[in-house]
Amino acid sequence: MPVLVVNVDHVATLRQQRKGKEPDPLTAAHLVELAGARGIIVHLREDRRHIQDHDVELMARTLKTRLHLEMAATEEMQAIALARQPYMVCLVPEKREELTTEGGLAVAGREAFLKDYLAPIHARGILSSLFIEADEAQVRAAAAIGCPYIELHTGHFADAPTRAAQRAERDKIVRAIGLARSLGLGVNLGHGLNYDNIYEFADVPGISEFSIGHSIVARAVFTGFERAVADMAAIIARFPA
């Protein structure tokens, strides 16, 4: 069955509003672990708007579960990944003006660059993933460079204005999952998933992980992290492998 990995960036966002020490995303990460999530995600952005370098360092040293590091494909981030050695790195596009990651990484046409970029990361035994749109060309390009995983962007599905539009976006994702699996790729889903819309994937086989952050942190404000994570993990536990 698929597993839950939880993004704690929004805890760091709240901390950075006051440039203080609280709330601590490391504490949130440990609570997420205790609640049964299989991994923690942090996005170390180039502008350091939420997660900071010391957060990654502390999590890499102390977490018992998997640390997933989201990052742009820059020399600086490559060096950090090699130094901290997370379980997985996920390459994502970044724009300074965006509130959150707005779309998938352009892989098609950049295969040679990305393959070379990931080579030293793979050599250290670190898994990699590419955050991409549910698009055939992007899926095939990801497979061509030898990346073991992709994460399909579910934001268009989550933000669809009508039920029909949502179903159309879901169908694109399901087709992309099937293609990726046929090419030997592991498939993760993430962006905009919540306690309601995640059921749209309850009958879809071939998903390895669900990457969820905002909706869990939002619920945790009222229920606490352990309850919020446990509720989502219980939903996913009923999904097929």
UniProtKB/Swiss-Prot annotation:
Q: Which GO terms describe its cellular component?
A: cytosol
| Compartment(s) of residence | Cytoplasm
Which UniProt keywords are given for this protein, alphabetically ordered?
Cytoplasm, Pyridoxine biosynthesis, Transferase
- Which parts form a coiled-coil structure per UniProt? none
**CDD domains per UniProt:** PNPsynthase
Under InterPro entries, the record lists: Aldolase_TIM, PyrdxlP_synth_PdxJ, Pyridoxine-5'_phos_synth
Signal peptide start and end residues: none
- EC number in record: 2.6.99.2
> What does the subunit comment say?
Homooctamer; tetramer of dimers.
What's the protein name? Pyridoxine 5'-phosphate synthase
Q: What is the species listed in this Swiss-Prot or TrEMBL entry?
A: Nitratidesulfovibrio vulgaris (strain DSM 19637 / Miyazaki F)
